[in-house]
Amino acid sequence: MDVGELLEDVLRIYSPSHGEADLAKYLLEYLKRFVPDVWIDEAGNVIAVKGSGGPVVWLHAHMDTVPGPLPVKREGGVVWGRGAVDDKGPLVAYLKAFLDSNPRGTLVLALVTAEEDDSAGTEALLRGGPPRPDYVFVGEPTNLHIAYAYRGGAKVYIELESRGGHASSPIYDNIVEELFAVYQEVKRALGHAERYDAFTVTPTIIQCGEAPNKVPTKCVMVLDVRIPPGKSCRDLAQALPPKARAGPCTEPVEVSPTNPAARALTRALLKLGVEPKLSRKWGTADFNLLVSLTKNIAAFGPGDPALAHSEDERIDIAQVELAAKALKLAVEELGIIPRRL
């Protein structure tokens, strides 16, 4: 398969969260050319299986991207487009590794929906579907680092209302000012700091005002809050001031950096002449959910995470190919390791 060509093709299919159907159909037809056991499940996930028996290894990546299409272009060995880094570059690497691998057990490719939103695709996999995994590799842009920890996360909402009034009159309370006061209160309550081991609070959406000469009657601010190790969703909820509320929350997770999946990747990279590097991720991903299936898990993939969700998403095709080679070696090594029951 031509990795660069496939990457360009999937980038041209815009697939924001809950809008992955066209991409899923494309990937289904593509995979059918190589493996017979492939389908789209009730959550819109594309699932492919090869081999049989144990151990069972999952290659997991997500089809969706953040909103906002970008033009797709290729210059030399670099491809630009929405999702080039997060997560279509890793997805293509995982797809290639799946097709190239000769597993001694069962190999599952799970290309899921809505990771950037409510993780509906992975939630469906947790309820059932393909054979349960002994080992999981999660496709995320790690720049070929092996990630073993992710922070938790939740959206926090500040929603204020007032009677409004004429902008020329100072007698009215202005909820714009109150909105920012509550935001600062949230930061103080959580001990916001730009460190991995601290809560981080980032405003992402502000909706406020109806006219330039009118005191607003409603203001909404959405905060992206990340939860550090050692803290929990409960800690977040208990710390929030009365005028802020948390939405659905994901707990932080950490597994052993020497678990079999991580070790298999370490050895694979060494065989390829790449220095293995471990990392803890500042974000939140389906990794946080998949640890409920197995602690033998690692996140890994091509792409610079600093470019994820940006207007300059781009990825080096050679790194996608290198990631696929490392995954293939790791999958085949795990096939000769006795399962941990």
UniProtKB/Swiss-Prot annotation:
Residues engaged in binding Zn(2+) 2: 86, 116, 309
Keyword Amino-acid biosynthesis recorded: yes
Active site per database record: 64, 115 (proton acceptor)
E.C. code: 3.5.1.130, 3.5.1.132
Cofactor: Zn(2+); Co(2+)
Subcellular location: Cytoplasm
Alphabetical list of CDD domains matching this protein: M20_ArgE_LysK
Family membership: Belongs to the peptidase M20A family. LysK subfamily.
Function: Catalyzes the release of L-lysine from [LysW]-gamma-L-lysine and the release of L-ornithine from [LysW]-L-ornithine.
Record's protein name: Putative [LysW]-lysine/[LysW]-ornithine hydrolase
UniProt lineage: Archaea, Thermoproteota, Thermoprotei, Thermoproteales, Thermoproteaceae
Gene giving rise to this polypeptide: lysK
